[in-house]
Curated annotation (Swiss-Prot):
Family affiliation: Belongs to the protein kinase superfamily.
UniProt cross-references to Pfam families, sorted A to Z: Pkinase
Domain text: The protein kinase domain is predicted to be catalytically inactive.
UniProt entry keywords in alphabetical sequence: ATP-binding, Nucleotide-binding, Phosphoprotein
Protein name per UniProt: Probable inactive receptor-like protein kinase At1g65250
Top-level taxon: Eukaryota
GO process terms (BP): cell surface receptor signaling pathway
Length: 372
């Protein structure tokens, strides 16, 4: 009955099909004007990684990616990202989108520098230039100053995606799983497999399915599949306030065991979470009681300047998740984060209440309604 079995395609045909799809993505994303990338053979990758040996394994950020170190004649240090997930036509599309966008942004300090890829292997890989060691982001281990720096780095990366190209790119899947830290503490955003571009002259695009962490989803994204730059701003606001400052893993961690009060569980959940944060601010509770307890324990004592920074940081995160018409752009968020770090120590009196330039024009209480 062997004749009934589906004949397996030769690897050369598979690589050619993937290459054709990648060319389509390069043309769609950047009119074919991306940074040059090298196509590695399967033998080159296997030799560089010692057949993906355990000794070359570096880290695993999330399913389905594994990262390996390697080297070859032209690159003494490279990082190889291997997708070990189940392969389908949809996954090939995502891989090609990841390669295309990575090739566009690889010159920026907050992205990995793409060298090339290998499409011949059963599980295709992407190859990055790496002169420094890179680590998985473990937020619980980071002190406050480094958390602020991580926030600014990722805000800068997202702002670049939104503004550096003729058509804005929306990242969509922000989470700590997609962030690497190099040995100097510079945060780098990875995995552009779900990036979507907004057509010229438009402010949003509609997608068939939402992807990412449910607790990071903006309202319009969940209800209507509408994606705009504000989709990333909302997710970043959650990442700032809930992960970097408060140390929450997910919304559900904070509300575990509670029953929803309405049929619209998502809407109820989001509004209740916003009210919780707002009441925390209005009650003027000490930051020692609000911020990530692990971080506070390591700090020992919070200075007045650090307390002001944390309050400004939290208020900015609330602005990011506030009413759609008043949500800042990622460029504004990145600038404000830089300001919080640099000028707060020089002008603590003007920011003693944690007020930021972005929230001075509006009562913070209006952020109860999350209408992104």
């Amino acid at each position: 009955m062997g004749w009934l079995r589906k004949k397996k395609k030769p690897k050369s045909d598979i690589a050619s099909e993937r290459g054709a799809k990648l060319l389509e993505e390069l043309i769609e994303c950047c009119d074919g004007k991306s940074n040059p990338i090298k196509f590695f053979s399967a033998d080159e990758i296997l030799k560089a990684t010692n057949d993906f040996s355990d000794s070359n394994f570096v880290l695993r950020l999330e399913v389905p990616f594994k990262w390996y170190s390697g080297k070859n004649e032209n690159h003494p240090m490279i990082l190889i990202k291997k997708d070990v997930g189940w392969w389908s036509g949809l996954r090939v599309d995502r891989l090609c989108r990841d390669i295309a966008v990575s090739s566009m942004v690889s010159g920026h300090k907050n992205f990995m520098k793409l060298v090339g890829c290998c499409l011949e292997l059963d599980y295709p890989v992407m190859v990055y230039h790496s002169v420094k060691k890179h680590y998985k982001l473990e937020i619980s281990e980071q002190p406050w100053k480094k958390r602020m720096k991580i926030a600014e780095d990722i805000a800068t990366a997202l702002a670049y995606l939104h503004t550096a190209f003729p058509r804005p790119f929306v990242y969509r899947i922000l989470s700590h799983w997609n962030i690497l830290l190099d040995e100097d503490g510079v945060a780098k955003l990875t995995d552009f497999s779900h990036c979507v571009s907004i057509p010229e002259g438009e402010t949003f695009v509609r997608v068939d399915r939402d992807v990412g962490l449910y607790s990071y989803f903006a309202d319009n994204y969940v209800r209507s599949g509408l994606v705009s730059d504000k989709t990333d701003v909302f997710a970043f606001g959650i990442f700032m306030g809930h992960r970097l400052l408060l140390g929450y893993e997910y919304y559900f961690e904070h509300y575990r065991g509670e029953e929803e009060e309405s049929e619209d569980g998502f809407d109820s959940l989001m509004k209740r979470h916003a009210r919780n944060l707002l009441s925390t601010l209005k009650e003027d509770r000490p930051m020692e009681e609000i911020a990530d307890s692990k971080m506070i324990e390591k700090m020992g004592q919070i200075s007045e300047q650090e307390r002001c920074q944390m309050k400004a940081f939290l208020k900015l995160s609330l602005r990011c998740t506030g009413p759609s018409e008043e949500v800042p752009t990622m460029v504004e968020v990145a600038k404000e984060l830089n300001k919080i770090q640099r000028s707060l120590f020089n002008d603590s009196s003007s920011l003693s209440s944690g007020q930021t330039q972005l929230d001075s024009a509006q009562d913070i209480s209006s952020t109860v309604v999350l209408s992104n």
